[in-house]
Each structure stands twice: as structure tokens, then as C-alpha cells.
């Protein structure tokens, strides 16, 4: 009887949840040998094509940096935009394209945001449409995989770029 009561309470609790509440998110697969930080930028798109998001408040000593998700080397983590918003709404607000920036966590800890922005010290940037996200099944990989070769990105697929005496990718 106690088991039945517990099950009823659980079922009632689940049924009272708002079915129209959505969160937009994607899984980030870090297949590299370094820890990375992932940042979604959808509000700055109209300003400059290659703009690094202006997160002046990034604090490398804090585990809580709004807008950033850390992904350990050789692991996967979920990036979620909180709130009741659909993917379609996110892309509509972002003029149909979002940018996902991938940074080396050590770079974020070592350099000021001004230096990172000025030197464009990113590992990867994906410029994604909703169609791209659906094609990728909301999975983002670093480094890029063959599935992303036709996606707009910088540096381009399979291209190595040297920044501040360091070869990326």
C-alpha cells in the first residue's frame, strides 16, 4: 500500500509539470587532450562577423561563469540555455544563426579578456543555423569531426591555425 501511495505521488507530481517548458541545449563532446570552455553567443551577431563575446566578467578562479560551460578533456557535458524557450525562439532571436565559441580553459585563466578578444584566442567557432543543429542532432564536437565539415566554422574544417606561438586543432 505504501508503495502504491508513493507511486501515485510521483505520478501526480510529474503530471503537474508544465509540458510547454523547454530549455534549449546541446551536448559538447571534448575529444581533445585539453580542458575547454564553451560559450554561446547569440546576442552580438549583428555587430561584427568574427566578434568574440564580450564577457568581461569571466573569472578563471570561479566555477560559476554565466554563459560558459567547462568540458573536461575526453569527456562530454551538457550546455543549457535556462528558461522556457524553444530552439526555434533562440534562433529567431539570433537572426537564424548562433555562434558557439570554444576556448582553451588555460588560455582563459592566463590572459585577460581584452587580450583574448584582441588576438582572437579561440580554439574553434561554429556558426550554426537551426538546420545545422538538427543535422548535428544538437551534438557539438571539439575538435571538429567529418560530420561538421560543411558547417560554417573558424578555423575551417581540418585547417590548423597558429595563434600566440601555439598551434591550434
Regions found by a protein language model. Give the residues of each.
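Intrinsically disordered, low-complexity segments enriched in small/polar residues
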Residues: 17-25, 39-169
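Sec-dependent bacterial lipoprotein signal peptides
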Residues: 1-17
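Short acidic/proline- and small/hydrophobic-mixed sequence motifs that coincide with surface turns
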Residues: 33-38
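Asparagine-centered strand-capping/turn motif at beta-strand->loop junctions
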Residues: 26-32
Amino acid at each position: 500500500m505504501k508503495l502504491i501511495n508513493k507511486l501515485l505521488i510521483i505520478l501526480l507530481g510529474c503530471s503537474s509539470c508544465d509540458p510547454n517548458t523547454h530549455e534549449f541545449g546541446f551536448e559538447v563532446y571534448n575529444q581533445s587532450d585539453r580542458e575547454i570552455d564553451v560559450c554561446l553567443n547569440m546576442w552580438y551577431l549583428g555587430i561584427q562577423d568574427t566578434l568574440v563575446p564580450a564577457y568581461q566578467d569571466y573569472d578563471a578562479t570561479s566555477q560559476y561563469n554565466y554563459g560558459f560551460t567547462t568540458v573536461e578533456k575526453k569527456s562530454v557535458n551538457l550546455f543549457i540555455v535556462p528558461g522556457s524557450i524553444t530552439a526555434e525562439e533562440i534562433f529567431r532571436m539570433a537572426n537564424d544563426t548562433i555562434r558557439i565559441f570554444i576556448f582553451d580553459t588555460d588560455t582563459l585563466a592566463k590572459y585577460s579578456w581584452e587580450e583574448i578578444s584582441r588576438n582572437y584566442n579561440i580554439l574553434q567557432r561554429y556558426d550554426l543555423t537551426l538546420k545545422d543543429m538538427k543535422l548535428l542532432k544538437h551534438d557539438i564536437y571539439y575538435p571538429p569531426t567529418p560530420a561538421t565539415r560543411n558547417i560554417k566554422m573558424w578555423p575551417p574544417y581540418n585547417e590548423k591555425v597558429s595563434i600566440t606561438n601555439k598551434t591550434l586543432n
